[in-house]
Amino acid sequence: DINMLFTAGAIVIPGVGNIGFGITQMDYGEMDVTTLEYQEGTGEKFKATDLAASFTYSRKIVSWFAFGSSLKFIRSNIWHSSASAFALDLGVLVNTNFFSFTGKDQDGMNIGMSISNYGTRMQFNGIDSYQPIDISEYEEGNYGDVAGQFRTGEWELPLIFRIGVAIKPIVSNFMDVKIAIDALHPNNNSESINTGISVDNKIPGFGVFSLRGGLKALFMDTPQYGTTAGFGIQVNYLGNQSINVDYAYKDIGILGNMHAYTVGISF
């Protein structure tokens, strides 16, 4: 099984903005070590993991415009080899009163744009790439085990430009409905579109119960994604504080189905 853990936190500093951090960990589990000689396995096991740690700053300049940026450290490990990189995310959000039934900017059309993973290249290095080499195996009198190293290739991070639009066709004291659509332009795949809908049912004295659904990777040449669905519960307490519990289901094609669980606290 593949397990992913995401942990994040943020704090609002008056007059400064929002400061946040996040850690994403991916564990691909244990796998058998194989070689050309022992293709069924040597009896050893190895693990592969990924880690991304981010530091984020964002600020609302005016009531209708906000921006943010994240500095990320990314590291990938396979057995005794690892690769690392630094990357930057940049984004802006514009709230307009277009299609706003209340006349408020936050209830109108929201337009967002972002650039993700603008950073350095990655390259695997480690003791697994060290191998003894006989540079002249058919000649006598030379060193038979010269220290050598396989030089792995470099690769770029998946740079993604994204633009999205969201509207609220229904805004009331008991229910909000939001429809969103994103267009993606990555450097390592074809362009695609994500779309989704969220129905928030407001329960007086309790909180909010949300139902969500969407479609991912529309118009991608070879999509490996399908339908997404989920729900969320927000329980309010002590005025403006809340506990949030969310569940999401995602179809990932050849990798099967993914189930995601989130617990959050706002105070």
Q: How would you name each of these model-derived features?
A:
Residues 1-267:
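Subset of outer-membrane beta-barrel
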